[in-house]
């Protein structure tokens, strides 16, 4: 009886260790390349879908080292400042491409603003804001407002983001400690 209980405890511990390693490896994911718009690509949104890029940005989490790939035909993409984004003004772009396949490296935390080089395309919704997270930052957005259209004020308490950040970064550690605790507890149980 004791041997059977020991074997089942060891199997459970092994399974929990494997699960913890999978979770930890997912948390340590490296830089990613995001194709803007996924299968939709970089093009003028359909008339009733002008928020397609806002939805796309809100469904992804961007980090320093990631990159954005814009794939398009007979168009262009420009990185602009905040004013250029909201006014669809590409007269003074930070960077501009029209080669049909453009990649932008996300090399700093903060907001990146992208528009089509065509004013008409931009005003029809072909524009994108991407928020790049600080290292270990966990940022919860209002569910009704995607990150690409969230308010730009910094009025939130720095303590709130610091505590959220530390909670998010301690998750992999907690996942690794659970199997260790269970192993120790199971050996104590078996020894009695």
Curated annotation (Swiss-Prot):
Molecular function per GO: electron transfer activity
Q: Which residues are glycosylated?
A: 48, 89, 101
Quick one: where is this thing mainly located? Answer: membrane
What GO CC terms are in its UniProt record?
plasma membrane; side of membrane
Return the InterPro entries for the record.
Answer: Cupredoxin (IPR008972), ENL_dom (IPR041846), Phytocyanin-like (IPR039391), Phytocyanin_dom (IPR003245)
Positions of the propeptide removed during maturation: 167-192
Entry keywords, A to Z: Cell membrane, Disulfide bond, Glycoprotein, GPI-anchor, Lipoprotein, Membrane, Signal
Q: Which residues form the Phytocyanin domain?
A: 32-134
Q: Which CDD domains match?
A: OsENODL1_like
Q: Does the keyword Nucleus apply?
A: no
Q: How does it sit in the membrane?
A: Lipid-anchor; GPI-anchor
Q: Where in the cell is it found?
A: Cell membrane
Tissue specificity field? Mostly expressed in flowers, and, to a lower extent, in seeds, but barely in seedlings, stems, leaves and roots.
Q: Which family does it belong to?
A: Belongs to the early nodulin-like (ENODL) family.
Summarize the protein's role.
Answer: May act as a carbohydrate transporter.
Q: What is this protein called?
A: Early nodulin-like protein 7
The gene that this protein is the product of is ENODL7
């Amino acid at each position: 009886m004791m041997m059977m209980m020991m074997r089942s405890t060891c199997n459970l511990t092994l399974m929990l260790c494997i699960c913890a390693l999978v979770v930890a490896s997912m948390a340590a994911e490296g830089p990613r390349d995001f194709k803007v718009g996924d299968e939709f690509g970089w093009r003028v949104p359909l008339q009733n879908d002008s928020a397609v890029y806002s939805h796309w940005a809100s469904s992804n989490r961007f980090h320093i080292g990631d990159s954005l790939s814009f794939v398009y035909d007979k168009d262009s993409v420009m990185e602009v400042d905040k004013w250029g984004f909201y006014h669809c003004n590409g007269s003074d772009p930070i960077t501009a491409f029209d080669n049909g396949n453009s990649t932008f490296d996300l090399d700093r935390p903060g907001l990146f603003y992208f528009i089509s080089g065509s004013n008409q395309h931009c005003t029809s919704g072909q524009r994108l804001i991407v928020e790049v997270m600080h290292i270990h930052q966990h940022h919860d957005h209002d569910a009704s407002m995607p990150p690409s259209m969230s308010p730009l004020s910094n009025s939130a308490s720095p303590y709130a983001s610091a505590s959220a950040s530390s909670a998010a970064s301690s998750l992999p550690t907690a996942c690794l400690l659970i199997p260790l605790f269970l192993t120790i507890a199971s050996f104590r149980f078996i020894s009695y």
